[in-house]
Amino acid sequence: MIDISRKDILSDSLMQFPDDRFIKLPIEGYLDLLGIEPNSSQTGIINGLNNPKYRFMCAAVSRRQGKTYIANILGQLVSLVPNSHILLMSPNYSLSQISFDLQRQLIKHFDLEVIRDNAKDKVIELSNNSTIRMGSVNQVDSVVGRSYDLIIFDEAALVDGKDAFNIALRPTLDKENSKALFISTPRGRNNWFAEFFYRGFSEEFPEWASLRATYHENPRLSESDIAEAKKTMSEAEFNQEYMADFNVFE
């Protein structure tokens, strides 16, 4: 099951926004070169981010749907436009390394020219003067002081990142049409990720959009694995991890 807050965001096919789309390069061709056919949750995320009406996209997605992978793909697509700056935020240093490694793999796959690859600071600079920077919530001060075209919060619900975004990072989205993507499996209903997610369903926040996708949207999951998970996990645990349900834990 997939639930999208805004009716003009589709999940069954990639949408075209010829005039003001956020991702300037052809997405379909890029995905074809990677051999990727996006699942419905990934398609919804792409369409929501690409839609010029929305600046803030929240995606509550069950486990193993390729959310970190598609987030990194979107980050690199934006970086292919000269002088673009992308920030990939993670809860901690270890998780930021996953995105750093993914970016290196994508760069190698497309044989992009890199003029700086700083493993210590986790910054990659391409020959077109675009930068892809990794950051962690517990060291957010190290990534302020610059403007970003796209900020991606991966596994956002795993840590309290509200202050990191509102105080440190929201002011860095000062470019016209700069955007933020928050993506995670839920971790209860009384936290910042849930608050941001429900903004997408409110007319009070017209620039926000949200998506929730359960395990049914993952074509790679087997029915036998789902049956085993249901037997070995509590109902609340299963609903959170596989149904992307906010309401099972506080």
Question: Language-model features: where?
Answer:
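Phosphate/NTP-binding elements of NTP-utilizing enzymes
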Residues: 2-250
